[in-house]
Amino acid sequence: MTNMSQPPATEKKGVSDLLGFKIFGMPLPLYAFALITLLLSHFYNALPTDIVGGFAIMFIIGAIFGEIGKRLPIFNKYIGGAPVMIFLVAAYFVYAGIFTQKEIDAISNVMDKSNFLNLFIAVLITGAILSVNRRLLLKSLLGYIPTILMGIVGASIFGIAIGLVFGIPVDRIMMLYVLPIMGGGNGAGAVPLSEIYHSVTGRSREEYYSTAIAILTIANIFAIVFAAVLDIIGKKHTWLSGEGELVRKASFKVEEDEKTGQITHRETAVGLVLSTTCFLLAYVVAKKILPSIGGVAIHYFAWMVLIVAALNASGLCSPEIKAGAKRLSDFFSKQLLWVLMVGVGVCYTDLQEIINAITFANVVIAAIIVIGAVLGAAIGGWLMGFFPIESAITAGLCMANRGGSGDLEVLSACNRMNLISYAQISSRLGGGIVLVIASIVFGMMI
């Protein structure tokens, strides 16, 4: 005789599937425990504003919206998926007043006071460069600056062309659109550009900065979207893409890498030691030893790329240590990226700024300039022996975004976080090149 009180098998399966559903690797009941804890903290306004409280809220918020972003149709394919969803939601939570001041302070302390972003980028640069074949690395660095220059040329040509369509003079297009977009972001681009503008022309730096940052904000959005599109193009036309590898190895003969022995936690820890030590040396060089070259300040991340590259070329690092640094880099890029994106949304994204900048002319001009940067870098990269997709992303889009945080947004949108070292060359050394160009262009306006 059938027991009528027994629930159907399909109902049991549904409950089992729900309980087995995982958010950031956690079963739903376990994540629910974390979320309820965060909500209690929110409603009682009781959150430690140190790194513990900051990481708690960043992990819990990043996990749920990361899962939504990677599953949302269209958004996950064309807009950038989980990382973009996370930083947009986090920015909205600040804009709408959903986050309390304590929550904002906790996240800001992680991002700004503890400078988690610097640690994240330093680890990724070290792992990315040490994992590259030494001769291949030398070739890529030598050919990369010309590729950046081609990206700037492409952006300038397309920018001038669309400017003429809208009746905007060439000098104004270069000054207010092309240079801010290609200038390496906010702190390393828009801010020093406004200072150069003021010192050369005598005009208001505030007026220039407010326009430049608005255009840069729009361009950053297009850079993220185009990164996702380039990833799709690369998958459909595989000859255009190295799937995360910049150099076309077929065009360059390299020796085999040394075989790697067993990797322990100690080699991974050494990877962290090297990341922080190379960052420290780069910081000392940038701030005290060589604060500028030819009047142009070189950012410490640009120095770090060169220092880690020299360390790789020196042969001091065993294959096991290199593999340990790569393992640490993979952990940061795969397990902590969603956490970081909450901080990017809270600390480095101003939705009001984006809203204010959205006019038809600004949107069209910014989009065309970014397309020019992509095409110029792709062509230049191909001529230098690089894959067009990877060179377009690093030397094109990572020049046209908003610097360090923009690099992470762009690379995460196209699943190429291992290219962070080249992205940093674009944002830092490339940004320095743009500052030199700006001083010449602004001088011609007088």
From Swiss-Prot:
One Gene Ontology term from the biological process aspect of the record: citrate metabolic process
Keyword Cell membrane assigned: yes
Reaction(s) catalysed (UniProt annotation): citrate(out) + 2 Na(+)(out) = citrate(in) + 2 Na(+)(in)
In its keyword annotation, does this UniProt entry include Transport?
Answer: yes
Lipid bilayer topology = Multi-pass membrane protein
Keywords, in A-Z order? Cell inner membrane, Cell membrane, Citrate utilization, Ion transport, Membrane, Metal-binding, Plasmid, Sodium, Sodium transport, Symport, Transmembrane, Transmembrane helix, Transport
Q: Where are the transmembrane segments?
A: 28-44, 51-71, 81-95, 116-130, 137-166, 213-233, 265-287, 300-315, 328-351, 360-381, 417-438
Classification via NCBIfam families: ccs
Impact reported for C317S = Retains 79% of specific activity, response to various thiol reagents is not affected
Q: Which residues bind citrate?
A: N186, G187, R402, G404, S405, R428
Family per record: Belongs to the 2-hydroxycarboxylate transporter (2-HCT) (TC 2.A.24) family.
Q: What else is known?
A: Allows the cell to use citrate as sole carbon and energy source in anaerobic conditions.
Q: What is the organism of origin for this protein? A: Klebsiella pneumoniae
Q: What is this protein called?
A: Citrate/sodium symporter
| Topological region Periplasmic | 45-50, 96-115, 167-181, 190-212, 288-299, 352-359, 439-446
Q: What does this protein do?
A: Secondary active transporter that catalyzes the uptake of citrate across the membrane with the concomitant uptake of sodium. There are conflicting data regarding exact substrate stoichiometry: the sodium/citrate stoichiometry was predicted to be 1, but the latest studies suggest that CitS transports citrate in symport with 2 sodium ions. Transports citrate as a divalent citrate anion, H-citrate(2-). Shows narrow substrate specificity and is very specific, transporting only citrate and to a low extent citromalate.
